[in-house]
Amino acid sequence: MDAVACIYLLFRRANAFAPDVTPPARLRRWTAAFFAILALGHLWYLPTAVLTSPDAIMLSMLIGGLLDCLTTIPVAIIILFCMLQDRRRPLWPPFVMMLPIIIGLVVCMINCNYDLLPMMRVYMSFLAAGLVIYMVHSVRQYGRWLRDNYADLEHKEVWQSFLVLAAILTMFGIYVSGFGGMAYEYIVQVCGLFLIFYLLWRVETLQTLEQTTPLPDREGLGESLPLSLDEIGQLLQQHCVSTQLYLQHDLSVADLARAIGTNRSYLSQYFSRKNTTYNTYINNLRIDHFVNLYREATTAQRSFTAQQLASDSGYRSYSTFSLAFKQRMGQTVTAWMRESF
């Protein structure tokens, strides 16, 4: 199954889960490598099934653990890094983190002495705790970066993925540690299958955030100009609000900055000084647009649905609109429409 998933990611050009999404190529390649390593992992643990000597079995397990530390664990961490697209993180730290374990395993195999194993388990526990702390901080930082740069967050947020992956990896950790008995062996097999399908889904539904279709600069401005807060506010009113540019799907802060003739840094500073984010600014405009459409439709006694009005207000996903509406208005769409009728 792992090998099939690897071949699928390497050679299939189109997405099966989300055909309209272009996933990060870096994430796709490293996930394919991870599946290839999982497939090979069955081979380097195979001798333990035929060996009878306890010492030989222990040596075989140590060799398998060494290969996992060289490949499986670092590549799994790299996949997590590749999901975060706010910056291009270096990929060598996961390999460096595993060096003490690798050295310890080599020493154990050479000396046929396993006294270092308890210390290595303690190191792995601290390493796992440190990685969790780092990833929680990075995911929170990534969420802020998304809200500062993108109006639409569909196929961009990743925090749910880390919760699911953390649960799956915890099950694997319990199994590898020897706790849990035979029941966990069957559970881990199920988790392994779920991990394959979940990673495939995650890779194919995560939108790459590289700029591919930039908007042209506003005529006559050329390079970005330093502007005051009042000037930026006027330009936003003129080139975003009046033109209803906020209705454009996947409008990024860089797109908007080019449209008004400044750069993203000045525009981000503007939103920061207004104690808001770019995402909140665009969502507020879209919700105001929805309210206007609703009032026009009710006044003219036209038939409509909330889903259609949300789509006309710039939202691809009704669930995203519902969440933004509740955050802005303090109540659900249904409750607001009932009170406004």
What are these regions (language model features)?
Residues 1-106, 110-111, 116-122:
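N-terminal low-complexity or simple alpha-helical regulatory segments
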Residues 19-40, 97, 120-197:
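Alpha-helical transmembrane segments of multi-pass integral membrane proteins
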Residues 113-117, 140-147, 203-216:
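A cytosolic-side transmembrane-helix exit/cap motif
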Residues 201-316, 320, 324-327, 331-341:
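Membrane-proximal linker segments that couple transmembrane helices to downstream signaling/catalytic modules
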Residues 74-90, 195-214:
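Alpha-helical transmembrane segments and their immediate juxtamembrane interface regions
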Residues 55-75, 183-204:
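Hydrophobic alpha-helical transmembrane segments and immediately flanking/interface helices
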